[in-house]
Amino acid sequence: MITLIATLKVKDGSLDEAIRILKEIVPQVKASEPGCLEYIPHTVRGDDKTIIFYEKYSDKDALKLHSANLMKNMEKLFPLLEPGMDIKTCFEIIR
């Protein structure tokens, strides 16, 4: 099991549009990537620029498939984002 925590920053005034786009993207990812077990974007209270993704993949191959599809799935969102993402790869200790 592989978990990613990805933090993205949207440009000023772009959060509502980013959320609208994510409501399209997330179901597509879940439908087309069976090894993607969780793909949940979050906002942060009091911060209108941050989106945090909680992502869980069954194995390395599932993560590779997601990475290969990332540009296509996120092409509408990328213009709304500030440069750079903070991505942390996590591994479960206890379940």
Where do the PLM segments sit?
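Absolute protein N-terminus
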Residues: M1-I2, R95
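A short acidic, often aromatic-flanked loop/helix-cap motif at beta-alpha or helix-coil junctions
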Residues: D47, I93-R95
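Short, well-ordered beta-strand segments in beta-rich or mixed alpha/beta enzyme
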Residues: I2-K9, E38-S67
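An amphipathic, aromatic/His-enriched active-site/gating alpha helix that lines ligand/cofactor pockets
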Residues: I25, A31-S32, C36-L37, K56-T89
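Short, surface-exposed ligand-recognition loops at beta-strand->loop->(often short) alpha-helix junctions
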Residues: V10-E17
